[in-house]
Amino acid sequence: MSLLSRMRKINDMLQKSGVQHVNFREMAETLRDVISANIFVVSRRGKLLGFAIKQEIENERMKKMLEDRQFPEEYTTGLFKVEETSANLDINSEFTAFPVENKELFKTGLTTIVPISGGGQRLGTLILARLNDSFNDDDLILAEYGATVVGMEILHEKTQEIEEEARSKAVVQMAISSLSYSELEAVEHIFEELDGKEGLLVASKIADRVGITRSVIVNALRKLESAGVIESRSLGMKGTYIKVLNDKFLVELEKIKAS
């Protein structure tokens, strides 16, 4: 397959990421197929975002690492010393992707490290590993292009996370601002009683203890539920089951109580 054909396959991956969520496993599989190497996409903190294996490595430590989807902290920290593509590192390199405890088995193994950057920051690392053939210039062009595409997807995910967090916070603030003073007081007591994200409460008991009417509690819960902040379910004589759906709710409630 020509360099152009292989670049087009990576480009297809880029086009797809613009219109739908592309998972990192699919990205790793595409890079594995066009570069013919084991591919590991590693986050800043060493989390294995995605990987694809061309040549199986029979080693228990490596298998566990892939199962846990986490690279060792020391190795991950070391990767940040690599600021530009480092190609064809042998088994004696501190960055080898092959198990050093089996040096004799993997003595021909070569590793290439490609930093993943975007938005002026280091986002992670693309690691490529081969047992025999060295990585040539075409492979490195594809690897660096692939790292750029992966970086764009990481940035896209980060942006989505920030937007989702802002939306969640706005929904909670609107829900809380819709409560009357007595309803807000009732809500504070309800979640003191729950002492967590979900649980069972008896509205009449709280009403009697705090000195508010049961209808105030019911109205407060109804408003929070219609905003999608909580879900509640009546269990008859046992009380009402409540579950917090929006993680920002309890945080905002604590801020109000502390102010």
Swiss-Prot record:
Pfam families noted in UniProt: CodY, HTH_CodY
Keyword Transmembrane (UniProt): no
A biological-process GO annotation: negative regulation of DNA-templated transcription
Residues found modified as Phosphoserine: 215
InterPro entries noted in UniProt: CodY (IPR014154), GAF-like_dom_sf (IPR029016), GTP_trans_reg_CodY_C (IPR013198), Transc_reg_CodY_N (IPR010312), WH-like_DNA-bd_sf (IPR036388), WH_DNA-bd_sf (IPR036390)
PANTHER family reported for this sequence: GLOBAL TRANSCRIPTIONAL REGULATOR CODY, GTP-SENSING TRANSCRIPTIONAL PLEIOTROPIC REPRESSOR CODY
Similarity comment: family membership: Belongs to the CodY family.
HAMAP family, A to Z: HTH_type_CodY
Official protein name in the record: Global transcriptional regulator CodY
Organism: Halalkalibacterium halodurans (strain ATCC BAA-125 / DSM 18197 / FERM 7344 / JCM 9153 / C-125) (Bacillus halodurans)
Gene expressing this chain: codY
